[in-house]
A protein has these predicted regions:
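N-terminal targeting leaders
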Residues: 1-179
Length: 179
């Protein structure tokens, strides 16, 4: 009888501990939690290769970026991300790149990233702004970080967009409010 009661107490304590560290509502989910759950869900989904797929979450908005081999994989990844508790919305920036093209694209994306980073360092307004290049996928540059002014944010987008090979600039940059 003592072992049975001890098992019940242990189970109740475990559930209480889980409830204490788990937010009550999806809106309370930390971004890191949403990102982790999305990554796990994608890794365990048939038809979605995660080797070239990245997930970021800012204020509940999940951003998928990277490359996938088919349009079906792109759609499936978005569907999975939308089903994650705490994901308020999903930005699907995934690029469809056939496996045969991936190596060439990755090399050119690396060169584009280097060029954008060099352009940022050469621009007095952007170089110490806190804005960075998170990734480049098939010519789509994803910017991230925090900055103090909208003007600096816009300057970074313009600088990145002016680099040869950039097809589009996406941004997750946060502009910190001034007091």
């Amino acid at each position: 009888m003592f072992k049975s009661q001890l098992a019940k107490i242990t189970a109740v304590a475990a559930v209480a501990g889980f409830l204490a560290i788990t937010p009550a509502r999806a809106a309370d989910r930390p971004d890191s939690w949403v990102t982790m759950k999305t990554q796990i869900a994608l890794m365990t989904t048939d038809g979605v290769s995660t080797s070239h797929l990245n997930v970021d979450t800012v204020k509940g908005v999940v951003t998928l970026h990277g490359t996938v081999p088919t349009a079906a994989a792109k759609a499936k990844a978005e569907e999975v991300a939308r089903g994650i508790d705490g994901a308020k919305s999903v930005k699907n920036l995934l690029q469809v790149v056939a496996k045969s093209e991936r190596e060439v694209v990755e090399k050119s994306d690396d060169a584009i990233k280097d060029s954008v980073e060099a352009a940022f360092k050469a621009n007095a307004r952007v170089k110490d702004s806190g804005i960075k290049v998170a990734s480049v996928n098939k010519g789509v540059v994803l910017l991230s970080g925090k900055t103090k002014s909208l003007e600096t944010h816009l300057e970074a987008v313009k600088v990145a967009d002016a680099v040869k090979g950039v097809h589009r600039v996406a941004t997750e940059v946060e502009v910190e409010p001034t007091s």
